C-alpha cells in the first residue's frame, strides 16, 4: 500500500494523532476502482464526496486539487483500489468541532482483490443498521455496524451478508448494494433512512436498468435472481442465500453486459473481486 496525506493543499508526513476522523469517525471516504492508471468513476465518486462533506459541514478541498493528486497516485497502476479519506482535521474540545483545523485527507492505493471464481454465497446478518436520515446515503467513516455484520459473515465462512434496518426491511450487503430480480425487473432497496448509496447503483438507476422498491426478507427469498454491486467489484451474481439457491439467470448476463459497455473494466476477470 502507498499513501499520501494532506491538510488542505499542503502535503503532510502523516495524519495527526488527534485527527477527528480517527477519534470520532468525523469524515467521509470513497473507495475507487483504478483501471489502466485512471479512475473511470471519479466524477461519480466526487459527487458523493461533495454531498458527504456538505452534510457534515466539512470544507472540501478544491476539486482540481483532489483530482490531480488522486490521478497522480493512480497513475501507473494497471488495476487497483484507491481510497480517499476526508476528515474534519484536528482540534475541537471533545465532540465540539468549533475550533477544528483545516480538513485533512489521505489517498491510499491498494491492490485489487483476487477474483471470485463462483457465484457469491450469502448469509443473513443479525446486526441491524440504525435509522439515521441525516447520514443515510453518504459514506461516512463510522462503519461499526458494517464491521460487526462482516464479523458474522466471516464466522459463517460466507462471501457476503445482507443487512436489514431496525424494522426488518432489507437494506444492502455489508459492502455492496443489493439487486433483486422479480417479474423481469431489477429492484434495489431505498436508502433514505440508512445505508450507502453506491456510485454503481446510481449509474444503474440513471440508466433505467434498476428501480427502487422496498424489499422484505420474504421478497428477497422469492426473487428470480440476486446480485450485488459496488464500484470495485462491478456486478456479481449471488448463488446462495441461507438455504435458498439460485442458478445462473440470463437477465444477470444482460445487466452485466450493459455495465461492461459503459465501463469496460468490469468485463475483465478481476472485476469479480
Give the label of every model feature segment.
Residues 1-72, 76, 87, 92-273:
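Helix-start/capping segments and mature chain N-termini
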Amino acid at each position: 500500500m502507498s499513501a499520501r496525506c494532506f491538510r488542505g493543499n499542503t502535503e503532510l508526513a502523516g495524519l495527526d494523532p488527534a485527527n477527528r476522523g480517527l477519534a470520532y469517525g468525523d469524515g467521509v471516504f470513497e473507495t475507487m476502482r483504478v483501471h489502466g492508471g485512471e479512475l473511470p468513476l471519479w466524477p461519480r465518486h466526487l459527487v458523493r464526496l461533495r454531498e458527504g462533506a456538505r452534510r457534515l459541514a466539512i470544507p472540501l478541498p478544491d476539486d482540481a486539487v483532489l483530482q490531480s493528486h488522486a490521478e497522480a497516485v493512480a497513475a501507473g497502476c494497471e488495476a487497483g483500489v484507491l481510497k480517499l479519506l476526508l476528515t474534519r482535521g484536528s482540534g475541537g474540545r471533545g465532540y465540539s468541532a468549533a475550533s477544528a483545523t483545516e480538513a485533512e485527507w489521505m489517498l491510499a492505493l491498494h491492490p485489487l482483490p483476487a477474483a471470485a471464481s463462483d457465484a457469491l454465497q450469502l448469509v443473513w446478518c443479525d446486526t441491524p443498521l440504525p435509522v439515521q436520515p441525516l447520514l443515510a446515503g453518504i459514506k461516512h467513516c463510522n462503519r461499526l455496524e458494517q464491521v460487526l455484520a462482516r464479523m458474522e459473515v466471516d464466522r459463517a465462512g460466507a462471501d457476503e451478508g445482507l443487512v436489514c434496518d431496525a424494522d426488518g426491511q432489507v437494506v444492502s450487503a455489508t459492502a455492496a448494494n443489493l439487486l433483486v430480480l422479480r417479474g423481469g425487473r431489477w429492484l434495489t432497496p431505498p436508502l433514505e433512512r440508512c445505508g450507502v448509496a453506491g456510485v454503481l447503483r446510481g449509474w444503474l438507476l440513471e440508466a433505467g436498468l434498476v428501480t427502487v422498491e422496498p424489499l422484505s426478507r420474504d421478497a428477497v427469498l422469492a426473487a428470480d435472481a440476486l446480485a450485488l454491486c459496488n464500484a470495485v467489484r462491478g456486478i456479481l451474481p449471488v448463488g446462495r442465500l441461507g438455504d435458498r439457491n439460485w442458478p445462473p439467470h440470463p437477465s444477470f448476463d444482460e445487466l452485466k453486459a450493459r455495465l461492461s459497455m459503459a465501463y469496460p473494466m468490469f468485463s475483465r476477470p478481476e472485476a469479480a473481486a
